[in-house]
Amino acid sequence: MKFTFVIPDSLPEMTVKVFLEEQLLIPRKIRHFLRTKKHILINQEEVHWHQTIKSGDECQLIFDEEDYPTKEIVWGNPNLVQEVYQDQHLIIVNKPEGMKTHGNQPEEIALLNHVSAYVGQTCYVVHRLDKETSGLILFAKNPFILPILNRLLEKKEISREYWALVEGKVGSKELIFRDKIGRDRHDRRKRVVDFKNGQYAETHVTRLKQFQNKTSLVRCRLKTGRTHQIRVHLSHHGHSILGDPLYNPHSKAKRLMLHAFKLSFIHPLTLNQLSFTALSGTFERELNQNG
């Protein structure tokens, strides 16, 4: 498989090595394959590792499929996929609430299976959403791009924003929660704030709107990606999410009022800025009824 793109005007001159490692964030294993097999071409010519590249140069990366075996997967239902964006390398979809991102067993059908059927090839999960959470989620369309997208996520180069309808009036316009999160010893399904043994977690919260019925609409930005992070942080600070079956079981909302509203990142190969927003019909209906 070949990927071809033009070095944008915004990039300064740099060596091939620096470009692959620091700009494209290509992991070491893939860089090794590209270098030893001479599978990076600049203006259709082989290059050495310390050669300088500049804006306007055409870059071509060649990936041998035998180096990246495709994982077999059971096809799902393509009609259940709501596409937001798709190109040669990746696809972004709007996940409905009540659907798992991926199954726990090979035969279990989840969003990953539906997306693979929709695309017509095996896709790969880059990040996940809780079953009860709706919203934007990113999948890799081939095993070459997956580790590159994973590295973007690890380096916090992928920005994720959520909307949540919470109990109470959020007093401050901006809040930052840095409480450590760990497992609940009494309920394996849940997580709790655990200052001693938990993992560091950081959530930035912005109040968007307050309602007369003592609820608030907030925007949450993740700086880390712990399980149930937003749900635990908001609940711990007295603002449980409406409809949360684990952390607010007495709420009358018909669904968890947490939605992954926005996804933004620089495309790792085209270097174009990508930013997408999407709402959910059920989220909007519940917001109108409970807000």
Features from the language model and the residues they span:
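Pseudouridine synthases involved in rRNA/tRNA modification
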Residues: 1-34, 81, 196, 212-215, ...
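RNA pseudouridine synthases
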Residues: 1-176, 180, 185, 286-287
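Short polar/acidic secondary-structure junctions
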Residues: 52, 169, 210-212, 268
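Well-ordered beta-strand positions
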Residues: 84-85, 130, 182, 206-209, ...
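Structural detector for hydrophobic anchor residues on beta-strands
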Residues: 162, 177, 201-203, 216-218
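Short Pro/Gly-enriched beta-strand edge/turn motifs at strand-loop
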Residues: 186-189, 200-202, 243-248
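Short coil-to-beta-strand transition motifs
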Residues: 73-78, 194-203, 257-258
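Conserved hydrophobic positions within beta-strands
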Residues: 83, 166, 204-207, 241
